[in-house]
């Protein structure tokens, strides 16, 4: 049986698929869709199911959604997700057998602890029901019938798995961007966080059936096997730069997207925890002693002791930390006491400073191939040591100027990617939240707005009232103000929705509170080595208003804990200008040289990107001249 149409998950793009044909000679039909949308006419390539080394399978596992201007082959190799299809088939048969056993011995609706299986996978028995898993004829084996790669994300790849159970599954395979210990830790916490959100917070999430934390399981990759949700991504309804309606109101679809995500946010922060860190199943955090219960007053006996507070898996604390031994790294990851909310800031600064020192030592010993200047690493050390100095004084826990300050400092669950891309809506209008990777428990006052609405640029609330002679401006100038207005509008709509669901916490969006946490936010949202400059900028800006904050009781101590010389401030100004010029003059600097594949191919075909002697790509001299002219023009206009 051949597949005539590519499978889909909402509007996730389907790149290629495998069709498995049952019979005496099992073989796969690999289908490659070489366009960036769902095609009805995929190409077909056959391979034997039992031949794991068939080269015709390789494209199914290779990364294909983008290219890098530098080290493209190396970056793509890190994102190859080759796994054992036969092993996946074995895992599916194993959870099916568990489902049959659970149906016989377990009361319907019972919640049993996770099952740590002999094949080095972990299954969640309460999700292994006939309704969820499906059925086959007696003596028949579970058989994968087709597979499709439906999403290649930043951190993992998603496959849709069809079977003879009459059910589809989702297989999530993380990229090997970090070491094995890091991936295992994050994966354990991700599954436990989703389990907690489902059973304790009442958030709809795809049910997890089974997971493995390393390559020793039958699939030979770390993985999560989940429920397949047939729906559309909420991102389809998100048009952030859409115009207001004719009567001056925001678009209905825009407001609806924000409302749905705000409802998730309200549930996530509804529970108070007993410490800061991340959520794990109890057995996965056994090494930690003297850790308080995750939360108090559990009345359901089946949930008592199910989860435990453990090391934080917030992305910034693990990203690019492979130079540090795991045991050393864990000393910076908590969990932290409920009575010391700013210890998270201090630990972040200590970790980043230590990581920069180790990298610098390797660089100076010619033992590192990293493309980073020693001067940048030295500056990082100074920056993050300053953040350590600032942390204890940053927030006055007894201030009267911030309403409900004690509640804002309590531990609350943070989903790191609260975004329309991570929400699925079914035909029945059921709304599911996806991708809990990197979830952590931290003070609400240190949680920034989600990235899809976050905006730190100039605020414009009403163009006609706030922009003099707007109608006389050029089209390009009008477009700039329109952009500012719409970004301001979107953030304001989010804050209004937040106030509607959680009015007692609205102080976290107040401008002074945003300024207080800005150095920490700049540190945890840092994407490149050079962005330490943004942490410096936030600390320097805070210094300018520190005395005012002290008089109003917002902060603990005066004078400001960090001293800057005139020379340091002047150098910072030069470095900041240079940093912004680089972002403008070097296309894709903000994405570390990554370019969506369609755009990459078009730029190469158009001669904008050319390959140099080292095999990397760079902007052609003609295109670079145009960019530099634009940068010079914009700088002159600014002056």
UniProtKB/Swiss-Prot annotation:
Highest rank taxon of the organism: Eukaryota
One GO cellular component, as annotated: mitochondrion
Keyword Ribosomal protein recorded: no
Keyword annotations of the record: Mitochondrion, Transit peptide
Presequence positions on this chain: 1-45
Coiled-coil regions listed: none
Principal place of residence: mitochondrion
Localization: Mitochondrion
Family: Belongs to the AIM9 family.
Matching PANTHER family: ALTERED INHERITANCE OF MITOCHONDRIA PROTEIN 9, MITOCHONDRIAL
Name recorded for this polypeptide: Altered inheritance of mitochondria protein 9, mitochondrial
Species this chain originates from: Vanderwaltozyma polyspora (strain ATCC 22028 / DSM 70294 / BCRC 21397 / CBS 2163 / NBRC 10782 / NRRL Y-8283 / UCD 57-17) (Kluyveromyces polysporus)
Lineage, top ranks: Eukaryota, Fungi, Dikarya, Ascomycota, Saccharomycotina
């Amino acid at each position: 049986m051949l597949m005539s149409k590519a499978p889909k998950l909402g509007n996730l793009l389907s790149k290629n698929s495998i069709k498995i044909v049952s019979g005496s000679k099992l073989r796969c039909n690999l289908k490659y869709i070489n366009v960036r949308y769902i095609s009805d006419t995929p190409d077909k390539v056959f391979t034997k199911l039992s031949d794991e080394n068939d080269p015709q399978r390789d494209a199914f596992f290779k990364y294909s959604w983008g290219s890098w201007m530098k080290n493209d082959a190396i970056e793509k190799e890190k994102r190859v997700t080759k796994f054992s299809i036969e092993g996946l088939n074995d895992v599916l048969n194993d959870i099916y057998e568990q489902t049959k056993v659970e149906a016989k011995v377990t009361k319907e609706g019972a919640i049993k602890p996770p099952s740590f299986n002999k094949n080095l996978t972990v299954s969640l028995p309460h999700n292994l029901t006939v309704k969820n898993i499906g059925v086959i004829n007696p003596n028949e084996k579970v058989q994968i019938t087709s597979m499709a790669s439906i999403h290649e994300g930043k951190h993992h790849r998603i496959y849709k798995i069809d079977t003879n159970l009459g059910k589809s599954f989702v297989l999530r395979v993380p990229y090997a961007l970090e070491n094995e210990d890091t991936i295992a830790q994050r994966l354990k916490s991700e599954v436990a966080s989703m389990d907690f959100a489902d059973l304790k917070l009442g958030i709809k999430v795809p049910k997890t059936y089974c997971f493995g934390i390393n390559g020793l399981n039958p699939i030979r990759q770390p993985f999560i096997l989940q429920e397949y949700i047939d729906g559309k991504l909420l991102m389809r309804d998100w048009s952030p730069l859409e115009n207001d309606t004719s009567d001056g109101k925001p678009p209905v679809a825009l407001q609806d997207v924000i409302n749905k995500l705000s409802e998730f946010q309200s549930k996530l922060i509804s529970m108070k925890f007993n410490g800061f860190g991340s959520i794990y199943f109890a057995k996965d955090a056994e090494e930690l002693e003297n850790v308080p219960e995750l939360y108090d007053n559990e009345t359901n006996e089946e949930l008592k002791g199910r989860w435990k507070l453990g090391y934080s898996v917030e992305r910034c604390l693990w990203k690019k930390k492979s130079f540090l031994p795991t045991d050393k790294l864990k000393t910076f990851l908590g969990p932290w006491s409920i009575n010391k909310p700013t210890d998270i800031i201090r630990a972040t600064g200590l970790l980043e400073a230590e990581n920069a020192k180790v990298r610098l030592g390797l660089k100076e010993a010619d033992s590192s191939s990293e493309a980073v200047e020693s001067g940048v690493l030295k500056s990082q050390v100074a920056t993050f040591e300053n953040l350590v100095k600032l942390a204890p004084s940053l927030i006055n826990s007894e201030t009267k100027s911030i309403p409900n300050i004690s509640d804002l400092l309590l531990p609350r669950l943070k989903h790191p990617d609260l975004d329309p891309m991570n929400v699925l809506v079914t035909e029945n209008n059921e709304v599911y939240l996806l991708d809990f990777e990197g979830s952590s428990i931290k003070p609400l006052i240190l949680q920034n707005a989600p990235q899809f609405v976050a905006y730190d640029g100039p605020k414009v609330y009403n163009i006609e009232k706030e922009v003099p002679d707007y109608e006389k401006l050029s089209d390009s100038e009008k477009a700039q103000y329109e952009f500012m207005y719409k970004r301001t509008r979107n953030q304001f709509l989010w804050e209004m929705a937040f106030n509607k669901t959680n009015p007692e916490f609205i102080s976290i969006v107040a401008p002074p509170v945003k300024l207080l946490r800005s150095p920490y936010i700049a540190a945890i949202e840092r994407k490149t080595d050079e962005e330490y400059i943004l942490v410096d900028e936030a600390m320097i800006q805070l210094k300018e208003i520190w005395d005012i904050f002290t008089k109003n009781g917002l902060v603990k101590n005066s004078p400001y804990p960090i001293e800057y010389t005139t020379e340091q401030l002047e150098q910072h100004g030069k470095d900041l200008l240079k940093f912004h010029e680089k972002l403008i003059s070097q296309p894709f600097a903000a994405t570390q040289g990554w370019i969506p594949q369609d755009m990459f191919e078009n730029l190469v075909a158009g001669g904008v990107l050319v390959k140099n002697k080292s095999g990397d790509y760079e902007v052609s001299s003609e295109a670079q001249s145009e960019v530099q002219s634009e940068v010079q023009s914009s700088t002159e206009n600014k002056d």
